[in-house]
Amino acid sequence: MSTRALVTEAPQTLGQPEWSTLAKKLDIETGLFIDGEYVEALQGKRFDSINPATGEALASLAFGDESDIDRAVASAKRAWHAGHWRYMAPRARMTVLTRLAELIDQHKAELALLETLDMGKPITDALTIDLPEVVSTFRYYAECIDKLEGAVTNTARGALHLIQREPLGIVGAISPWNYPLLMASWKVAPALAAGNCVVLKPAQQAPLSCLRLAQLFIEAGGPPGVFNVVNGDGPVTGRALALHMDVAKVSFTGSTAVGKLIMGYAGQSNLKRVALETGGKSPQIFMADLEDLDAAVERAYGGIFDNAGQVCNAGSRLLVHRDIHDAFVEKFVARSRQVYRPGDPLNPATTLGPVVTRAHQQGVLAKIEQGCREGAQLAMGGGEPGGLEQGAYVSPTLFTCVEQGMSIAREEIFGPVAAVQRFDDEAQAIAMANDSIYGLAASVWTRDLKTAHRMVQALEAGVVWVNCFGDGDMTQPFGGYKQSGNTRDKSFECLLGYTQSKSAWFDLA
């Protein structure tokens, strides 16, 4: 039996020794995936994939540069002109993506293990949260394929007007490392469903699961060249993809600063479409009349400490009414210490893994030190957990006595760091929440429906949760206001963004 088969059959109940054994046997693909097969980089460049829990190299991977992006785009262009994918009957394309979803589900243990080793996500989270969401994403967009409809408009007698929806052509997707396969699927699935060809550049820090996904697409019946994956960094590989004259659209998730660069690359090249999902500094607002403080606290710490705080919509700003502030902080600290257990991410009992790299860890710790220098008070955390010095760990951290002008209240940290701020009334809470360059998400906790409705209308965010945080399904558009981006992922709205309309006017007179 192959290593992949062993991993595929691994039950979710495996303990740490079993996962560690499987990790040692795992067959890791190291090439670029172009034209239906793994290939070496043309210039022979390579880079190491590092396990952030141990600091050890997992594998030496091919590094794609401009020449490899050219090769991948050329493969996609050949597939586009051949028409086997874009002209495939909708039901047939649906069958391929449905089969791909089934293969992802069958290989979820292998894919989860790749993500845990690659970026430090606890294996239990990867297996029970991320991978089921990836499967749901491909299934949802498979079901959407035959729902893409055109229109016949009312016109004068003797004329016929048709409006058709067509794919764009070649889509360049640049995905982040925090949810490697899930964030890639939010781009790849709708782009493929609409009939496009795709060149994916996964994050250099965590490309392994995306490389495997491309091979599963071929196994599902996808034509070679329709879906290609090129490893590499942002300044070389990502830039080449965003500048390429044959790419019709770039979809990017990452920092606001890089998003601005990509918009510039579109202007420098062919005015390609640019879809950006960028930074966030999401407020969670807790009104004095909320119904269940314990339940609110449970969701509050999950909103910032899950995935070690490496979430674009992380609820890192905790705006708490003065009347419940002290009780909130006490419960938050007590429960967070009970729930988040740093450790080996291959141990199913671990609930907090490392951050993605040692460099990122040092950046998060520097932000914590800056918060202390600015006068905020540490209520918990503030450094590295003991006994895990070999990995890139950061303890769950909570600041109190935070003022609106402090860096920890304004800058995205992308780590397990939360800041509590007091407010006196609804108007002040809204003003504090909206005082940000970001507008990705927000939440409101109140038992008063009128209050909730007013605040939903007033908050400058693309997603607002009421008495919950992070909930939703594939029907929910996800994206932000202001410098959090200009697009929506998930939902049918996202699918339309990978199409263009064509108007056909017939003179029948």
Question: Where are these predicted regions, by residue range?
Answer:
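Residue-level signal for inorganic ion chemistry
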Residues: 55, 93, 115, 138, ...
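Terminal low-complexity tails and localization/encapsulation signals of metabolic enzymes
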Residues: 1-61, 95, 99, 148-174, ...
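Conserved C-terminal structural/oligomerization subdomain of aldehyde/semialdehyde dehydrogenase
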Residues: 1-3, 56-59, 247, 285, ...
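Glycine-rich loop-to-alpha-helix module at the N-terminal edge of alpha/beta enzyme cores
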Residues: 56-148
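A short hydrophobic/small-residue beta-strand
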Residues: 197-199, 378, 463
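Short, well-ordered beta-strand elements within core beta-sheets of diverse protein domains
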Residues: 58-64, 81-85, 173, 284-288, ...
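ALDH superfamily catalytic-core signature
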Residues: 249, 257-403, 432, 466
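Rossmann-like NAD(P) dinucleotide-binding subdomain of oxidoreductase/dehydrogenase enzymes
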Residues: 149-295, 423
